[in-house]
């Protein structure tokens, strides 16, 4: 019998940068394993990915991307852009389509320009202004579609991202709604925070 897991991660791109947000609950079937897991992983000081799917697969991909980013920096003397990293990850996923990494990833970063992309397990790549992944994504994307504006500030995007994850957590039993991990990436760098709710 298959065990059900789930999560919700979202990303929003603005003119000022990128906001990534995710719940912090790890679940396995009907059991909550922890309420304190990080689902947004930094790859460089300007690029991060969100995790939905197999934790081991995402961790392996994150290690590959970190190594590729360091190699790129060493070879070319400049950081890899988030767009280039998204294309690289798309190729890695597509090369493994017969034995796929069971992941759905959002990649966000600010190297030269704010970039946000969504990747499916087979390497399908979509660049967008906002996106959501995981079992709660249908609920989160509805909130994002309703609240997104092209001219929104990073602070407004952060509030919208938290609201989207929290809404998903209220409707999707596999998404937590008590704590939201938020990563904001701008030209000034990357900042992480956790937004907690008592109820």
Swiss-Prot record:
Active site positions, chain numbering: 7 (nucleophile)
Activity regulation comment: The formation of the proteasomal ATPase PAN-20S proteasome complex, via the docking of the C-termini of PAN into the intersubunit pockets in the alpha-rings, triggers opening of the gate for substrate entry. Interconversion between the open-gate and close-gate conformations leads to a dynamic regulation of the 20S proteasome proteolysis activity.
Single GO BP term: proteasome-mediated ubiquitin-dependent protein catabolic process
Primary localisation category: cytoplasm
UniProt keywords, alphabetically: Autocatalytic cleavage, Cytoplasm, Hydrolase, Protease, Proteasome, Threonine protease, Zymogen
Annotated EC: 3.4.25.1
Known catalytic reactions: Cleavage of peptide bonds with very broad specificity
CDD domains in the record: proteasome_beta_archeal
Superkingdom of origin organism: Archaea
Subcellular location: Cytoplasm
Assigned GO CC terms: cytosol; proteasome core complex, beta-subunit complex
Molecular-function GO term, any one: threonine-type endopeptidase activity
Propeptide residues, chain positions: 1-6
One Pfam entry name: Proteasome
Root EC class: hydrolase
Residues in coiled coil: none
Described function: Component of the proteasome core, a large protease complex with broad specificity involved in protein degradation.
Homology family: Belongs to the peptidase T1B family.
Summary of subunit composition and partner proteins: The 20S proteasome core is composed of 14 alpha and 14 beta subunits that assemble into four stacked heptameric rings, resulting in a barrel-shaped structure. The two inner rings, each composed of seven catalytic beta subunits, are sandwiched by two outer rings, each composed of seven alpha subunits. The catalytic chamber with the active sites is on the inside of the barrel. Has a gated structure, the ends of the cylinder being occluded by the N-termini of the alpha-subunits. Is capped at one or both ends by the proteasome regulatory ATPase, PAN.
Name this polypeptide is given: Proteasome subunit beta 2
Source taxonomy: Archaea, Methanobacteriati, Methanobacteriota, Thermococci, Thermococcales
Gene that encodes the chain: psmB2
């Amino acid at each position: 019998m298959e065990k059900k897991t789930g999560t919700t991660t979202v990303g929003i791109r603005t003119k000022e940068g990128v906001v990534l947000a995710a719940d912090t609950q790890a679940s396995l079937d009907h059991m909550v394993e922890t309420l304190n897991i990080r689902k947004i992983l930094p790859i460089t000081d300007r690029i991060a990915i969100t995790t939905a799917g197999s934790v081991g697969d995402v961790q392996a991909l994150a290690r590959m991307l970190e190594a590729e980013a360091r190699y790129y920096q060493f070879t070319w003397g400049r950081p890899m852009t988030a767009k280039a990293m998204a294309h690289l990850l798309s190729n890695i996923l597509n090369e493994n389509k017969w034995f796929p990494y069971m992941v759905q990833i959002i990649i966000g970063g600010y190297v030269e320009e704010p970039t946000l992309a969504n990747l499916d397990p087979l390497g399908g790549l979509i660049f967008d202004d906002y996106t959501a992944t995981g079992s709660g994504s249908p609920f989160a994307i509805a909130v994002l579609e309703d609240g997104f504006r092209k001219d929104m500030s990073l602070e407004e995007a952060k509030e919208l991202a938290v609201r989207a994850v929290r809404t998903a957590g209220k409707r999707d039993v596999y998404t937590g709604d008590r704590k939201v991990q938020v990563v904001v990436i701008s030209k000034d760098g990357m900042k992480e925070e956790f937004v907690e709710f008592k109820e």
